């Protein structure tokens, strides 16, 4: 597959991942994520700090979508956008970002990419935390809201302040993950209805996205023998 991939031009629009970092030298990512677009606000390495490669997986999904179609084909895969990455979570031995500073960290990560390259981009924020008061604004969600409408902001203690008026020229599209469901139930519909989005997905000016699948057939791998899908499509 890697031999059939044609990366987008250097100045093409990008998906900027604010996540756990990306393993940039991955064979399917390296030509779409330049070293100059591989950042971190913690330490010096932009490589994935997650033990299971969360940021790398999210970057691959944003770049290719479902890989099955490409793997089963022999056609050239022409890409039309590039990747950027800012690592926002610590690796081994690095200091955790205080929860009160998640918003400030997001502002810093956003500025880092915009200073580095003036290209068009969509921000993909796939980090979240359990909310203390589900649905209510937080310092983090307020920072995302301000970034989305092109407003400068600052945290003063536990207060959030806007320091400029909205600027349409500086507006940004933020796609924010709805969060995770950490437990499983047979009645998945009730579980979906009763689960709340995680912070900062309650922000008003971002596009909050959750996950779904159309994979409704049992895998062919023998280890899944006897397994059945939980539900039908729709």
Question: What residues fall within each predicted segment?
Answer:
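Low-complexity, flexible helical/coil segments
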Residues: 49-57, 157-163, 211-214
């Amino acid at each position: 597959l890697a031999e059939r991939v044609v990366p987008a031009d250097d100045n093409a629009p990008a998906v900027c991942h604010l996540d756990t970092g990306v393993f940039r030298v991955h064979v399917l990512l390296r030509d779409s994520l330049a070293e100059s677009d591989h950042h971190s606000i913690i330490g010096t390495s932009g490589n994935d700090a997650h033990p299971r490669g969360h940021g790398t997986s999210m970057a691959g999904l944003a770049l290719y979508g479902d890989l099955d179609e490409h793997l089963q084909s022999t056609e050239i895969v022409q890409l039309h956008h590039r990747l950027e990455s800012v690592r926002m979570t610590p690796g081994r031995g690095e200091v955790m970002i205080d929860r009160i500073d998640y918003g400030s960290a997001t502002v810093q990560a956003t500025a880092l990419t915009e200073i580095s390259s003036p290209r068009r981009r969509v921000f993909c924020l796939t980090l979240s935390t359990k909310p203390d008061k589900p649905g209510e604004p937080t310092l983090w969600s307020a920072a995302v809201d301000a970034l989305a409408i092109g407003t400068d902001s600052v945290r003063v203690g536990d207060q959030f302040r806007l320091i400029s008026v909205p600027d349409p020229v500086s507006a940004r599209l933020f796609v924010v993950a709805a969060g995770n469901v950490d437990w499983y139930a047979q009645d998945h519909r009730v579980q979906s209805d009763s689960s709340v989005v995680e912070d900062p997905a309650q922000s008003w000016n971002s596009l909050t996205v959750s996950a779904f699948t159309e994979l409704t057939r049992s895998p062919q791998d023998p280890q899944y023998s006897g397994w059945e899908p939980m539900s039908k499509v729709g």
